[in-house]
């Protein structure tokens, strides 16, 4: 007799697993993490093993997936597409190998090991070398006919190569979406207003279930073959590795990571290696599949109800787990972006304790409907910040209310605003907001910006909180005394400890002044009262007496190194400086493009936003962001302060000649984004007046008489009726004229001395950085490449050049030393 509780539990587990199967396999909308599904399946499997009468024919332990969706016709698999048993620990893998060695009598059998892709399993059927049908796994016995969609995948051969294939061949494999392609697709989807894909796995599954193959063809899907189903008798195999080799020969892509390993040690070593590189792979994997390589051994091992005994999936630690949202807080970034963050009940995800996860923005919270108190699925992959990916609404407690963005910044109290059509809310406090100042400074000193080594996040927070540093320019006024004072206070865990440590550096009246500072900030020196929470910050904000630092009692080398690093950063390149400013939408690539095109900070900081569209790959949104930044008096003052403190651009140069075509009147009209003014209409309007201010004087009748269509003519005249637009047009024309006057003559532009030449730089240059040298060479037409080849025109070799110099010698590539480079640059900078 089966006890009631196990029977009820088994029924509940079956119901929940079947519901999860339906959402996962049919709707492509997973409701629970894979780890939760695996736990429930193992629990049900254990119950059915203990009480065999509980097992039912439709139990999830007996079947692979769910019944097929009704949108596609059914395909019955000639050879069932079975699932694999899972191993979650090394002992389970050892037991898997032990069973095989005991049955086959081999001490170290060979296994085929390969990553387990997180995609959609499919079966491809070929007759006489021609692809005739493709189907999903479905429930393992019956799948969905997705032939038309699979034909759109370029990685699936429509006709097999060579002539050794069997007359009938079923190939099993995985359709997946590479992560870079997934991210690129979503970027385009957002720009075009399409629905974004939730994750690569859902993207692959949903793409194959599109009723319109044209939609599938737009999705970046790939395929790897990993086995076979039905095969005609005219071809036979002896091992799984032989099967994979044949599949490659017939034109199927097979994972290059497949390896033949031996015994349990080989399996676990492979697992460790793949676990190490997992997050660097261009596709998602959730474990490793081990298959006994010898086919006769596979036959002898046989099957259990739902899986082969000769194969197993060794799963990685789960990258998704469920937990509870305890609070939703707002973090303020360097550009003022207000990012909601979920504070979570601590949970282990991929081996790391996660206590918070990003919610990205308010729209994402609304889409997921995340509420405080909800049970959510949290995902963490590699170094990626943990994120909430789904809400388990069935577990929502009663009475929880929808979340809304607060109207005030939690740091400075300024209004939080959102521009029309934008996804991001921002604190309007700008540099008056301490949170934005901290993030702006952290970005400014980062390695790819001004590269100030030794100034960490904690130090930046203390410098800002203590009002020692108000902006990035203040870094260049930091003194050894200020930094040592900072270290002395922060190392002291209590006021008493601070006074004790201070005796090594100050005595007499100055020591009494320090005691008075502590009393002023609320510290009871008798030790009986409570210590104020922020006493260290308050002490640092006070006016200190002079200290005679005893260098034997306090470390000073770190402070000296930091001041030296700050001093070195005064000499920088234009692209580094622009990137360091932290303008919205301006990353390294955009900063480099701006520096290459305009060449001079004095030019860039005066330009109106439309002229930034002259730079390749900069559109209206980015151009407006740069223009807005440069139009703010506080930002111009910050640049002035940096220049005043000795920051110098070492690679300034005239604007590039390629700007000329972007500075015509027709181009300026396009850049202004006036409604109804198409590129063709802009060319027409440019024939009516030589400059923007003169074109602004044309009235509607004059435009109509000149043949300009009514909608365009009316839109233009209405646009010029705005005083702000008139002012913008005049400023734009003036800056355009200034740029044109500074451009190289057309003759010189066509005779760049390094046009078409590939140049490699290696080693350290004494007179300028390699970045600066590369920029100067690019201005003269060179293409800078990273490796030496026969096509390399010349190699610039500084100190400690390394292997590139050896390769250049071997290939007889021309080699320039620094003196020759400087002579060349000086020769052409003078022209």
Swiss-Prot record:
What Pfam families is this protein classified in? Answer: BRCT, DNA_ligase_aden, DNA_ligase_OB, DNA_ligase_ZBD, HHH_2, Nlig-Ia
Name what cofactor the protein needs.
Answer: Mg(2+); Mn(2+)
Keyword set, alphabetical order: DNA damage, DNA repair, DNA replication, Ligase, Magnesium, Manganese, Metal-binding, NAD, Zinc
Give the EC number.
Answer: 6.5.1.2
Functional description taken from the UniProt entry: DNA ligase that catalyzes the formation of phosphodiester linkages between 5'-phosphoryl and 3'-hydroxyl groups in double-stranded DNA using NAD as a coenzyme and as the energy source for the reaction. It is essential for DNA replication and repair of damaged DNA.
Name the SMART domains on file: BRCT, LIGANc
BRCT domain segment(s): 749-831
Q: Which family does it belong to?
A: Belongs to the NAD-dependent DNA ligase family. LigA subfamily.
Task: Fetch the Gene3D superfamilies from UniProt.
Answer: 5' to 3' exonuclease, C-terminal subdomain (1.10.150.20), 6.20.10.30, BRCT domain (3.40.50.10190), DNA ligase/mRNA capping enzyme (3.30.470.30), Helix hairpin bin (1.10.287.610), Nucleic acid-binding proteins (2.40.50.140)
Q: What is any one GO biological process for this UniProt entry?
A: DNA replication
> Which residues are in coiled coils?
none
Please give one Gene Ontology molecular function term for this protein.
metal ion binding
Mind naming one GO cellular-component term on file for this protein?
Answer: cytosol
Origin species, per record, is Xylella fastidiosa (strain M12)
Give residues annotated as binding Zn(2+).
409, 412, 427, 433
Q: Which InterPro entries match?
A: BRCT_dom, BRCT_dom_sf, DisA/LigA_HHH, DNA_ligase, DNA_ligase_AS, DNAligase_adenylation, DNAligase_N, NA-bd_OB-fold
The catalytic residues are 116 (n6-amp-lysine intermediate)
Q: What is this protein called?
A: DNA ligase
Substrates-to-products reaction catalysed:
NAD(+) + (deoxyribonucleotide)n-3'-hydroxyl + 5'-phospho-(deoxyribonucleotide)m = (deoxyribonucleotide)n+m + AMP + beta-nicotinamide D-nucleotide
List of residues binding NAD(+)? 34-38, 83-84, 114, 137, 174, 291, 315
């Amino acid at each position: 007799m089966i006890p009631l509780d196990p029977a009820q539990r088994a029924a509940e587990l079956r119901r929940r697993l079947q519901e999860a199967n339906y959402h996962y396999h049919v709707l492509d909308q997973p409701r629970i993490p894979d780890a939760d599904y695996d736990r429930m399946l193992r629990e049900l499997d254990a119950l059915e093993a203990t009480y065999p009468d509980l097992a039912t024919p439709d139990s999830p332990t007996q079947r692979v997936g769910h019944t097929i969706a009704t949108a596609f016709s059914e395909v019955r698999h000639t050879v069932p597409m079975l699932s694999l048993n899972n191993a979650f620990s090394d002992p389970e893998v050892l037991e898997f190998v032990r069973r095989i060695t005991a049955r086959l009598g081999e001490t170290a059998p060979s296994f085929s090991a390969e990553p387990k892709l997180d995609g959609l399993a499919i079966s491809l059927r070929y007759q006489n070398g021609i692809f005739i049908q493709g189907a999903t796994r479905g429930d393992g016995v019956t799948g969905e006919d997705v032939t038309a969609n699979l034909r759109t995948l370029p990685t699936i051969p429509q006709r097999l190569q060579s002539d050794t294939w069997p007359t009938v061949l079923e190939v099993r494999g995985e359709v997946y979406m590479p992560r870079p392609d997934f991210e690129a697709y979503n970027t385009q989807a957002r720009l075009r207003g399409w629905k974004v894909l939730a994750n690569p796995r859902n993207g692959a599954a949903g793409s194959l279930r599109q009723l319109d193959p044209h939609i599938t063809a737009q999705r970046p899907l790939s395929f790897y073959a990993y086995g076979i189903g039905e095969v005609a008798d005219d071809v036979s195999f002896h091992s799984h590795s032989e099967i994979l080799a044949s599949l490659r020969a017939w034109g199927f892509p097979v994972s290059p990571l497949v390896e033949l390993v031996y015994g349990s040690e080989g399996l676990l070593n492979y697992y460790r290696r793949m676990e190490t590189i997992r997050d660097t792979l261009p596709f998602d994997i959730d474990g490793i599949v081990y298959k006994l390589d010898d086919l006769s051994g596979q036959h002898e091992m046989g099957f259990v109800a739902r899986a082969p005994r000769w194969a197993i999936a060794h799963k990685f630690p789960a990258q998704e787990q469920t937990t509870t949202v305890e609070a939703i807080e707002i973090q303020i970034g360097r550009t003022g972006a207000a990012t909601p963050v979920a504070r979570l009940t601590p949970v282990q995800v991929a081996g790391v304790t996660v206590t918070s996860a990003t919610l990205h923005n308010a729209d994402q919270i609304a889409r997921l409907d995340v509420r405080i108190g909800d049970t959510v699925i949290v995902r963490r992959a590699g170094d990626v910040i943990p994120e909430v990916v789904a809400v388990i609404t069935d577990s929502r407690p009663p009475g929880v209310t929808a979340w809304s963005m607060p109207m005030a910044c939690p740091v400075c109290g300024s209004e939080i605003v959102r521009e029309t059509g934008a996804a991001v809310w921002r604190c309007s406090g700008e540099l008056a907001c301490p949170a934005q100042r901290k993030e702006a400074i952290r970005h400014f000193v980062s390695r790819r910006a001004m590269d100030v080594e030794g100034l960490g996040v904690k130090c930046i927070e203390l410098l800002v909180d203590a009002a020692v540093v108000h902006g990035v320019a203040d870094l260049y006024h930091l003194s050894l005394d200020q930094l040592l004072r900072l270290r002395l206070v922060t190392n002291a865990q209590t006021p008493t400890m601070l006074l004790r440590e201070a005796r090594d550096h100050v005595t007499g009246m100055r020591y009494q002044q320090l005691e008075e500072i502590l009393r002023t900030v609320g510290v009871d020196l008798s030790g009986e009262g409570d210590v104020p929470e922020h006493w260290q910050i308050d002490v640092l904000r006070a006016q200190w007496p002079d200290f005679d630092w005893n260098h034997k009692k306090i470390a000073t080398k770190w402070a000296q190194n930091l001041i030296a690093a700050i001093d070195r950063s005064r000499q920088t390149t234009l692209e580094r400086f622009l990137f360091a400013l932290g303008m919205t939408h301006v990353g390294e690539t955009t900063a480099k493009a701006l520096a290459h095109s305009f060449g001079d900070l004095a030019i860039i900081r005066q330009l109106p936003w439309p002229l930034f569209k002259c730079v390749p790959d900069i559109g209206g949104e980015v151009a407006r962001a740069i223009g807005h930044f440069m139009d703010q008096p506080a930002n111009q003052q910050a640049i002035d302060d940096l220049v005043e403190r000795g920051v110098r651009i070492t690679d300034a140069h005239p604007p590039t000649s390629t700007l000329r075509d972007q500075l015509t009147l027709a181009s300026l009209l396009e850049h202004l984004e006036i409604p109804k003014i198409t590129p063709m209409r802009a060319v027409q309007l440019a024939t009516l007046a030589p400059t923007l201010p003169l074109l602004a004087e044309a009235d509607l009748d004059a435009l109509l008489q000149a043949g300009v269509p009514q909608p365009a003519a009316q839109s233009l005249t209405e646009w010029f009726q705005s005083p702000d637009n008139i002012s913008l047009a005049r400023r734009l024309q003036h800056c355009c004229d200034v740029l044109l006057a500074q451009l190289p003559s057309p003759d010189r532009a066509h005779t760049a001395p390094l046009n078409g030449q590939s140049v490699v730089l290696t080693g350290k240059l004494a007179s300028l950085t390699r970045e600066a040298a590369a920029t100067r060479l690019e201005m003269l037409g060179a293409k800078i490449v990273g490796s030496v080849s026969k096509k390399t025109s010349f190699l610039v070799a500084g100190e400690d050049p390394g292997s590139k110099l050896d390769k250049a010698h071997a290939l007889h590539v021309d080699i320039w030393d620094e003196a020759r480079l400087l002579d060349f640059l000086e020769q052409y900078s003078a022209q």
